[in-house]
Amino acid sequence: MRSMPNEENRSELDLLLESMLSLLADGDTEQAKQISEEVLNRSRSGPERDHLIEARVRLERALIGLVPTDDIGGELRWCVDRLNAISRGSSLHGLALLNLATWHANRGELMMSLATHSEISLNNGHPIDIKSLSRIEVGRILLSMGDYAPAKRHLWSARSGFIESDMVPEAVAASLEWLDLALDEIDEDSPTMSAILENASPREGPGNSQNPSNPSDIADVVEYLFPLLCNDLSGQSRIDLGLILEASEKLDRPIWKNALKARKEEIQDSRVLDELQS
């Protein structure tokens, strides 16, 4: 019978953590900071001690500036190591890895960031949404390093995972970033992205590489993007529509350009309008 109060206390602590996270989501950082102090103290000692809650609240406190700047990296690493021991492969473990990888990237430590991202995988049990968020960041890092072929591969992997997870805004972002790279060089004899992913093998390290894109992949991406982007054609800077027009020209598929031309009165980007006139 003595276990019942402990269970009630744990539930209360869970609710307190949820309240803190809700405040953060609503932008009420100051109130969240106050609650986080109580959650931290209660989770790390006494009858309510809970390693998982402690790791979560320490992760959030590191991200909202409650840890000295010089200690943030160490705190994030502590969270990763603790979660690796008690909840390996969970969404929270993946989230901690994502934040540690981002911390390294923001400091210009790109190889450390890539190494941290490599710990996130479906084989380790991480859910596909976390894996996809990792892959899009890896793609961006490799793109910044001029390593275009693997950047395209990781962006495509992220895109596929986002679509599977019904994460539409993220899928659109990954699709556009992949398309921007893919349009640089096109060859109908190039392998498709699915074949490239199937035959991909680890490399010793990044390099500078590029491979032409298969036009069928480009067409698939445009067909996915087109109805989503056409929900609203307004906006003074529509780089996304520019990519659609470029794909229409390079693949010799005027249907996309003609569809935009039929709705040009809705388009505000002068560069897109000029392209439609050409």
Model-inferred region functions:
Residues M1-G27:
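N-terminal leader/linker segments that initiate helical-solenoid repeat arrays
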Residues M1-S11, D189-S278:
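C-terminal non-catalytic interaction modules
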Residues S11, G46-A55, R88, L92, ...:
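Structural signature of alpha-solenoid helical repeat junctions
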Residues E18, I53-E60, L92, L98-N99, ...:
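"A position-specific structural signal for the A-helix of alpha-solenoid helical repeats
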Residues M20-Q31, E60-G74, A101-M112, L142-P150, ...:
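Short coil/turn connectors between adjacent alpha-helices in alpha-solenoid helical repeat scaffolds
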Residues E37-R44, R77-A85, S118-N124, W156-D166, ...:
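Amphipathic alpha-helical segments of tetratricopeptide repeats
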Residues L98-E109, N124-H126, E137:
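Alpha-helical adaptor scaffolds
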Residues D129-E137, L142-W156, S160-L183:
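Solenoidal tandem-repeat scaffolds enriched in leucines and small polar residues
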